[in-house]
Amino acid sequence: NVFDYELNSDALFTYHDSFANGLHVNASAGGNMMQQSYDMLAASVVGLITPGVYKLANGVSNPNVQTVIKKKALNSLYFTANFAYKDKLFLDVTGRNDWSSTLPKSNRSFFYPSVSVSAVMNELFLMPEPINLLKVRGSFAQVGNDTDPYKTSPYYGTSDFPGSAVVASTLYNQDFKPEISTNYEAGFDLRMFQNRIGLDFTFYYNRTK
């Protein structure tokens, strides 16, 4: 018997405007409330006393009962903003803060942002005639992640003996911190001789801890 569900509640606000100086803005901000629940109850026996009678009481062995209960809550606030100036300069900014029930109280809140910029250099500066396009770009981004439920402190498990429980033998890290992946990217796009020759270059570095 398995009962598994996820409930999400979202709110989102958006803003868009264009200004006379050539600046275009798109922005949004919102939040999410997520709840997960997993309940599993299973029982099995080895062999049947009476063939064809599939009941726990008809097992040759004692019933092996397994119960798994997992619950998780994750609340989030986030924003994103995109700026474009005369289709020459571009800036994208995002940010998100999560509060996870699977982490210790002292580390339950974690924030991860991102910033990316790009510029069409041939629209900003005078370039040699063979160059049709020169666009440079760079970005910084972080992504956060929590863990599964009940990974930070010991808990009682079920036992085959009725009315009893098992003490966990694992030593848990009670200062468990969220996983943060940080990546950097830089590069450029070059098109020359009426787009007959092109070059794309990207440098990428990622670190997770």
Give the ranges of each region predicted by the language model.
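Extracellular/periplasmic, surface-exposed regions of secreted and cell-surface proteins
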Residues: 1-209
